[in-house]
Amino acid sequence: MSDVKYFEDTEFGLIEAVATIDNGDFGTRTIRFETGQLARQADGAVTTYLDDDTMLLATTTASNQPREGFDFFPLTVDVEERMYAAGRIPGSFFRREGRPSTEAILACRLIDRPLRPTFVKGLRNEVQIVVTVMSMNPEDYYDVVAINGASAATRISGLPVSGAVGGVRMALVVDEKHPEGQWVAFPTHAQHEQSVFEIVVAGRLVERKRGNKTFSDVAVMMVEAGASENVVNRVKDGAPAPTEKIVSDGLEAAKPFIDILCRAQEGLAQRVGNAAKEFPLFPPYTDEVYSAVERKVSKKLASLLTLKAKQERDDATNAYMEEIEAELLPKFEASYSSAAEASKEIRAGYNAVMKAIVRRMILTDHFRIDGRGVTDIRDLAVEVELIPRAHGSSLFERGETQILGVTTLDMLKMEQQIDSLAPGDAKRYMHHYNFPPYSTGETGRVGSPKRREIGHGALAERAVLPVIPSREEFPYAIRQVSEALGSNGSTSMGSVCASTLSLYNAGVPLKAPVAGIAMGLVSGEIDGKTEYVALTDILGAEDAFGDMDFKVAGTADFITALQLDTKLDGIPSKVLSDALEQARDARLTILNTMADVINGPDEMSKFAPRITTVKIPVAKIGELIGPKGKNINALTEETGANISIEDDGTVFISAADGASAEAAIEKINALANPQLPKVGERFLGTVVKTTAFGAFVSLLPGRDGLVHISKLGNGKRVEKVDDVVKVGEKIQVEIADIDNRGKISLVPVVEED
């Protein structure tokens, strides 16, 4: 039974809250929050443990003064992965940690997304949350532990937040005892391998009323989910497919664990007893400004919002905002320290009124600002093979969102090497997402990817990974790049669609095509009843105006990835399940459109490398490589092929043409499955070494013979071997003798007239 216990050590000032997570047949996990020992000068510091081995220190600190000129909340979240946590020295040149790993950046986003909405609106003091991974059991994930630790540190810091946030990772584990699957909280990596779907859920406790009774409930704030890499094969073998119902069940299964984690944090905060601190708040506008703007703009602004083209609509609403600003500025200027301050509030009030108008029209009329119905998808356009020398390329357009997908294939030795606390040391399928400023018609910094780009790339990668063929089926490293050339709503899901098209164009035999769609949800009171309207294929503006956005990617049969963020205090199960079904209908429509252009792998590009495999005995690996790589380097030089050897004896051969590959295969087979040369056999060999007594000639990789100096002169006396042959020279030889130790004596072949 899941439970919370508290411990206090008054002598040392330590306070602990221990939450026990009961996974039934899969045992229990323990989350322990401890404060009072480490980082005492931070506003809030909590050491969080998962069982005994995984340990994270989370701190929350706020600046003393608000930042001037900021019109947003300056919250920063950093995750510091210390390699000593895994008993390792960093592999970098300086042997110390450098820039954060991709896993650390994704953990930062997982923390930021549910915690940011809990802070009071109008806060302008800088707040920094730092999570340091100090000890790491290689079987555990630390990211969800970090969510809880960061929330607990913030909760005891005295900062104005609405409550604690609990985070849990759930895996649908399928084994012989649980053929239908069981949801397991805080799964190990071994359980991850047995699962078909994983879901990270973060939420908080809210008070609800039922009649005269008040009770606590869990409001889901964030979801990040994905299918396992081997889900297609597992489903074929009888495991449950991760359908929309499975996802809904996973959310419900997570709620009891979130409840216990939130209660543990709240209990810790009560026992610490830090008083709430007072911070100046800077609301974006006053009620007076909002009312003045609302009275002036409602009717005309509503008509401007019906313009279908994004640029035309934006230009019209911005011009009208400047007109309203000019009218109202004289009235409010005297109430502010400067005209700029008054102008900023009027603009903020204008945007708030515009948001309210759009939301009201959606709820009452099912109106959308581009004229579509709530379930309609924007016009789709699909094209492949755009980039001449790329191995695969595609262009996917959905309305004004435009994504270019480009696929590059290479040898497995080009897979990404990972030096982080995450499990695994290499990644074969890499998805990189770029979002240049021109995609929204703006200027800005270009260069290294920002956190948002890394997050979007990871989401698209997670969506496509379950359908990537295995190494044995397709022995290539695959790099997929998504270029967001135009953005007006969900470039990440557009990247999923473009990736499927591009991968097929490159000849990658995907297990199934994948598509994605972004959904929105708007809710509000209409005639005393709460109404919910789900929107298919949301625009950028609808994303900003809505209460929830979620992105769903998958095949025709099941979901491969899902991301959800909501501002609501909970979503009725039926509303969520209906929205997921609505997303599935849209996904099927997009998949059909894509299939009309390309529905399977094309022939591989002539510019792509041809990779074949040969299996050799493990005992022959060293012989193939040779001393200091002599043999394999010679093979590469002679054939022009690139050769990579796996520990199990699998040899991957990459060549620009079939002849080079065949030559390499022939030489590798000759060495790996050697048949002793026979007396009388002739070879065109290469002189590899000369000595005072003769020349050594390479017949096959690792197989040399000696032409004695007495045999080199065609019956004439030779003083120096180098006078007749030189290293690197080709020479036709015949095997004259093989002694009982296997040493080969050669004689030159003299062509007869």
Swiss-Prot record:
Record field: catalytic activity: RNA(n+1) + phosphate = RNA(n) + a ribonucleoside 5'-diphosphate
Keywords linked to the UniProt accession: Cytoplasm, Magnesium, Metal-binding, Nucleotidyltransferase, RNA-binding, Transferase
Gene Ontology CC, one term: cytosol
Span of domain S1 motif: 680-749
Main subcellular location: cytoplasm
Cross-referenced Gene3D superfamilies: GHMP Kinase, N-terminal domain, K Homology domain, type 1, Nucleic acid-binding proteins
Protein's UniProt name: Polyribonucleotide nucleotidyltransferase
Gene: pnp
